[in-house]
Amino acid sequence: DALQEFKHVFSKQHYHSPSKFTPIKYGQKIQYTDTDDNPPMTKDQVKFVQQVTGKLLFYARAIDNLMLHALNDIATKTNQGTTTTLEATHHLLHYAASNPNGQIRFTASDMVLNCHSDAAYLEAPESRSRAGGFLFLGDKNRTQFNGPILVLAKIIKHVMSSAAEPE
């Protein structure tokens, strides 16, 4: 078990999401990004984060695809990461401990390939955009949800000049 391997201390609090929620500040004209002034991680902490992301990536791809966004976010910040990255890793481990019985259910369907996709403009570090997608088999009315065939959660390498380009 990955949680035992990483000597994870279980929290009494239940974690409902794999990453921390950043509340939206309505009414502001400009939404500023948070600056991370925390100290950088040590080499041992970087190795720990790499081991956790590597171990949980298999589980996330196979069973709990909700972890993919958090894993992608943590993995992109690992080399220049700070203690905030380490806290995000511990949050992900708390989520995994709170939700140990993930499952995917496949049911008989009309075999219609459905796709939900989206992109977020300038959401990732270094002014990059993020893309996400969810492909599954279901019915033509999109009322039947089935287990995923492909889940995409990645950062687009190139900087887009407008919000329409990543879409």
Model regions and ranges:
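Long, low-complexity, charge-biased intrinsically disordered regions
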Residues: 1-167
